[in-house]
Regions:
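Internal, well-folded beta-alpha domain core
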Residues: 45-211
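Glycine/small-residue-rich interface belts in oligomeric ring/scaffold proteins
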Residues: 1-44
């Protein structure tokens, strides 16, 4: 699930998996223009937290999106495990109702969530800062090379959140069953991100690893 030459990070002895639903807007590659029917779409990713050569980043187990062109481009140019999904995002008051079902297989998510605090910046050394303030992602190319994509963003404007999760089978392809309430919930209204092109850092074919 994670390449053997990436280290799964732990916070106070615990490794974390995140399920992150959101909506993308303004996705474009300079100098191409922003085309709303191409560059705006829902996305849901399943991630864990890794490092290579001392550089902390994110490893995606899966990324689901409703835009088939975006799925193709992300697989082709960023080597990311994108999947095409049927998705619906509806604003409800201050919150969101979010539904996603992968076109193939049983991976699905349904839930409603909303913020319950004012926005704030996480404090260095805390779990929420460790989870959110990451500035690269790792992926594996078709020949087994590990690639790193650097990203830039301002610090996340986080809000505490509550959620009603009606269905979450996003981890079943990993052999993980999710029951009970989420261990940690956050909400963010908006974050602008700049993404660089992937760069090889060396690698091998993946092996199952555990922290």
């Amino acid at each position: 699930m994670v390449p053997s030459n990436l280290t799964i990070q732990q916070f106070d002895g615990t490794a974390w998996i995140g399920v992150v639903p959101f909506h993308m807007e303004g996705v474009m590659r300079r100098p191409l223009p922003d085309l709303p029917w191409v560059s705006a779409f829902p996305e849901l990713n399943v991630r864990t937290y890794v490092e290579r050569d001392g550089k902390a980043g994110v490893w995606f187990f899966s990324l689901d999106a409703s835009n088939s062109l975006a799925v193709w481009a992300a697989r082709r140019f960023f080597h990311l495990p994108y999947f095409h999904a049927s998705m619906q995002v509806v604003a409800q008051g201050h919150g969101i109702d979010y539904r996603s079902r992968r076109k193939t297989g049983n991976a699905a998510f349904e839930g409603s969530y909303e913020p319950v605090s004012q926005p704030y910046a996480s404090t260095p050394g805390t779990l929420e800062h460790w989870l959110t303030e990451r500035y690269c992602l790792y992926a594996e190319s078709s020949d087994g090379t590990i690639v790193r994509t650097d990203v830039h963003h301002r610090q996340w404007p986080l809000q505490k959140a509550r959620a009603e999760i009606r269905r979450n089978t996003m981890l079943e392809p990993l052999g993980v069953s999710v029951t009970g309430e989420a261990s940690l919930l956050h909400f963010s209204r908006r974050l602008d991100v700049v993404v660089w092109s992937p760069e090889p850092v060396g690698g091998t074919r993946p092996y199952l690893t555990s922290p």
